[in-house]
Curated annotation (Swiss-Prot):
This is Serine/threonine-protein kinase atg1. InterPro entries: Atg1-like, ATG1-like_MIT2, Atg1-like_tMIT, Kinase-like_dom_sf, Prot_kinase_dom, Protein_kinase_ATP_BS, Ser/Thr_kinase_AS. Keywords: ATP-binding, Autophagy, Cytoplasm, Kinase, Membrane, Nucleotide-binding, Protein transport, Serine/threonine-protein kinase, Transferase, Transport. It comes from the Eukaryota. It comes from Botryotinia fuckeliana (strain B05.10) (Noble rot fungus). The gene is atg1. Residues 386-398, 459-475, 553-573, 793-806 have a biased composition (Polar residues).
Amino acid sequence: MASTTTSTSSLSSRRQKTGVGSFTINEQIGKGSFATVYRGTHMPSGNLVAIKSVNLSRLNKKLKDNLYVEIEILKSLYHPHIVALIDCRESASHIHLMMEYCELGDLSYFIKKRDRLADNPTLYDMVQKYPMPVEGGLNQVVVRHFFKQLSSAMEFLRERDFVHRDVKPQNLLLIPSPEWIAKRAKGGPEAMKASKESVVAMVGINSLPMLKLADFGFARSLPSTSLAETLCGSPLYMAPEILRYEKYDARADLWSIGTVLYEMMTGRPPFKAINHVQLLQKIEKNQDEIRFPSRGIYSRDLKDIVRRLLKKKPEDRITFPEYFAHPVVTEPIPGLVGDDRPKEKSPETSIVRQPSLRDRQRESPTVKHIDTAYESLITRDIGEQSPRTPNIESNQPFGTPGRSSGRPDSRDRPSPVSAATAPNVDTLPRQRDRKDRTEPNYAPIVRTGSTKQRYDEQANLQPKNEVQSSNSITEAEQDVRDAREYVLVEKKAVEVNAFADEMAANPRLGRANSAPKQLPRRHTSMGEPNSTTGAVAVPPSRIVQRASGRAQPDTSSARNSYGSYGKTGSSPSTASAIAKALQGASVRVFGVSWSPTLIGKGPSPPQLYNPYPAYPTPNAGLIGDGRPIDEDQRVVNIIEDSATRSDVVYGFAEVKYRQLIPLAPSMNHGLGGPNPERTGDAMDEDDGLTVEAIVNLSEEALVLYVKSLSLLSKSMDIAGAWWSRKQRGGIVSGGHTPGSDSSSAAQAGNRINGAVQWVRTRFNEVLEKAELVRLKLVEAQKRLPEDHPGHPNNRSTASRLVGGSSTTDGVVLSSGITAEKLMYDRALEMSRTAAINELANEDLPGCEISYTTAIRMLEAVLENDEELIPRKRSSSLREDKEKSEGGEVNGINFGDRKDVLKVLQMIRTRLQVLKKKMTAIAKHQSMPPPSSSPRRSYSGGTTPTINNTPPK
């Protein structure tokens, strides 16, 4: 062992003193199967090179041929994103290749050390602008940058009919950014350049590191029509046809490119195995279903190209022309900040407009289709594609981030995100024209059709030579557009309330209701987690004031505004288990509680919020007889189910809301009055939260409120369609039906009316709280450091959206957060905790609450906003896959929906098992104790103790 060490040391020492031509060989920096790489110095200039030293004695004839092929290829290739060959020297025992020195190492090291990149001074600015995600791979801006440069190199190779055959992160080397190289302090050692153009990026961003493709040892000239059959490359990145020992062509490189892109996005290869046989089995078993980690945020267009590259059959893969023309390759990188953004703006302002979440046009005599005007509360910045960047497809099984700039079709967060939660790039509507994909740094702006037409006309008429003047009047135009859009938010609330008022005023429906025609709005904020009280009055926003068209009710009337409906639907004794579960979920699962002394006593104890009331089980006459009454009952069930799901989402949002906006001072001491030592507005109290934490909470609360609004809006849409049919048929408005049918129809009508009143009240409350959260988010974004990507100064005017503020500072969600991803993660967390407690036989009623709430959350995730009357789940999934692009519904692709369904079914199964267990326990406890015997007594089991054994 000692002799070996001495020999190695002396060899290294001799190597350091060895000169090869005008170069000296220094320390070793890498080692492969057949070659060792050293850092070298060009003696005349002192510049650094990488010297690849190959020991010829270790090579057979075929490997020598490969080496000479590599040399010939490198001599003919001059491209900024391909490592250049500077010189080549051959001796009797070695061949030395002097190549460009890439001081940042390879891409695999870059990915593994992403959390420490800021320690390198050449990368510090990059990390500050585009922070790396806590989990997963690289920031999506960096991913797109590297992918563009790799694609540029591959396109150069394809033009010359070369196939690399060993594309992998270890063969993708990095050098500092051109900007850094240009301003590097003189005097220190520099990397030797093959030419001036070798450090000028052809694509990408000048402030980010440059990527160079290296190691052409397995490369060869292979025209498109030719096939090879040599097993080459690294197994983890090999194409399946190579692993199968089949003939292959240049399309094998497409697979390797897809694996590299996947690893950049997620931090790990798409398939891992201990040998190539198992690797091939995994690829075959996967059936081209490429999954992305659920905790990551990935843009839709990036996921699209990965899935098109990673097809196990070469003929199914994207072609090279399609690959080079893909939006991720050709379009500007979204999410740039600071000086990375283009300096010149197009005279025509590019605006991505998000259409209504439901394009279906349904009209009733009373109310036309209720537009989702709350969409104007939020938008998604196409900025950075990191966990804290826009999509982003959220994925999140969600999830998800395409958009008009090639960014994730919001995208996200998640991803997953549904169109109902607008923030995620992967969830933005897919019906966008390719011509919109021109501006590299803007976010979708919610506009109505009329506003869109007016603004498009203005943009099209703008002269080309008015670039400067257009920038100077942008703010004024934004003010005008914002003023117009602000009315639309009120219009949404007005339509909701108008429809609810008409139903409440109907004589037949109103008989059973004691509520007034104009139900007063309930403006409350939910009690904080440790509060001893429930609903508290908060100042009403202008949105609700204008929408209602009247003065706001006082606190007492607001608190009891829904009490009559709760009594109409059912008495407290008829509350179902699900209603109790939903009410208890906010306490046990979401961590929100109220004083135990206020529960179970008094006619109407204060509550955190009005949970959706339960109804008595319908009688048997309403089930399955095929008459119109059956349809009424079905509509009732659908409306109530959707309202219940919205209630669960609302409860989750309230947790975020209470962390974000502290209670008024009077609430901190229950009903005992305010604390004289505490003063100030609750909106100004951050309760110790950092600015970034406030931004995060605001975004999460906002997307959850918007999801709740979408479910409430859907309930109202269904009720509106039912109301229109009934008015045409005269059933509710005064028509006569025989006997019990008339009674059943009236009962169904009353239940729908009650649901509509509840939805109206909740809608107004959620809309107001969403506005408060929006204001909080805008305020927090202004307080971020000026160099932070989320700061308003780092966003273009086109990416701003105003939803009711008097200023021009709009709301931009700068992260990939989606409601679906938040809900999915929360449901998993609750079900896992419940499963652990169930196995331990601890708190079984609490387990039932957790299971039930998780089920409702996952059902809300799967809710299809484009579908009024839901179909059966299996049919819905199948038809949704066929009709939607990429099999996506609300931004959640078909594969992710299947995953959610599997989890949902498992939780339902656990809930059924739990109920059986609880029933058995209750039955056992209700049994009378066994009668005592003078001769024998048992200790509760079937095995008698020694003292109880009868004498023989």
